[in-house]
Amino acid sequence: MKICLIDETGAGDGALSVLAARWGLEQDDDNPMALALTTEHLELRKRDEPKLGGIFVDFVGGAMAHRRKFGGGRGEAVAKAVGIKGDYLPDVVDATAGLGRDAFVLASVGCRVRMLERNPVVAALLDDGLARGYADAEIGGWLQERLQLIHASSLTALTDITPRPQVVYLDPMFPHKQKSALVKKEMRVFQSLVGPDLDADGLLAPARQLATKRVVVKRPDYAPPLADVATPNAVVTKGHRFDIYAGTPA
């Protein structure tokens, strides 16, 4: 995959070249999207809209730390949707990991989560965030046990993941309505890189075959059900719903 690669570390240790080789990234100086290695982290930038800033994965500080410490925990909609109850903490495959937010919430509550991400740039961002998270004194211990990254396409990986999870979680990119053009800055940068998941409908059937208990699909409230398969079961929040489908018992 071609992207503009920028090294701002000043270390001169070739770390960016190693990273590019690992994730199959090619230097493209004219690409509007850039992956920059700073002294703090790896971040994604939209070069033609610099005011949007850089996107990076941070499990240790910022919004994620606030959500972990002061968020709803088990009361969060995603936790309710996957079926967390009492001692039941399902094993989850997050088949559309994105920036790892929902996966992190589930891991922080106690679930073991395997994240799938097919886009190499997004996978590199997740891997960078995980490395910093694993090294953190406060959360590193449980994070290493509960949150892992698999760089693969969900369309193929969902058929051969072992052991089978109890829950498969899907949050495919959905084209935003025109009127929400001022979508969060971060989402604009992210969508410029990955675009909508046009093949997302193909995920529902293999996800239901893989999950032993249920499949949870996060949708904007205005979006039709995934693959046009309606379900009466959903956890509804302001702006979103979590559609729930039966899996295939082991």
Curated annotation (Swiss-Prot):
GO terms for molecular function: rRNA (guanine-N2-)-methyltransferase activity. It is found in: Cytoplasm. Its EC number is 2.1.1.242. Its main location: cytoplasm. One of its GO terms (cellular component) is cytoplasm. PANTHER family: RIBOSOMAL RNA SMALL SUBUNIT METHYLTRANSFERASE J (PTHR36112:SF1). This is Ribosomal RNA small subunit methyltransferase J. It comes from Klebsiella pneumoniae subsp. pneumoniae (strain ATCC 700721 / MGH 78578). The gene is rsmJ.
